[in-house]
Amino acid sequence: MALLKGVKPQYAIFTADREFADYEIDAYARSHNCPIAKRVKSTNDSFAIMKDGTKYKWVKPTDSSRGYKCSTGIIDLATCSLEFIREWIPYICLYAEPEKNYVFVDSSNTKDSKPYDLHTLIDRLQKIEAILGNVEKLGFSDMEYGWQRLTYLSVNAKEKEITFDTDC
């Protein structure tokens, strides 16, 4: 179901980490070059209304969040459980279209964090699949070659290493 013409979008930031929600609100304000008109920050709430009328709200991934409705979901893959994503987000993001209105972020992925291990990667991919279904285009962006599609997987059991290859 799409938003009615003229209705401003409402973004829900699904994360257990309020500081990360605050960071995401500030990042979206900067990236969209839209100043914040009203801001509420407290222990249990983080909310912003931009000058253009767009709203951003921190939504804790708990059963009590199910009454909130939004048009776009920003989902923290590190703190939202697979069950919450599968059972509640499609009903909370009532006006969202899976191909356009979901943003996946990972609050555990910082410059100081360790690289993903296999269990973490599987966890993140299962959560994405719960919303998008099967994603057929898997790859990465390379500064030299641009978009590179993953085409082959090799496993070195002795070194406990998995390698993804491309056509290049």
Per-region residue spans from a language model:
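Phosphate/NTP-binding elements of NTP-utilizing enzymes
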Residues: 1-135, 149
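Detector for the mature cores of small, proteolytically processed
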Residues: 125-168
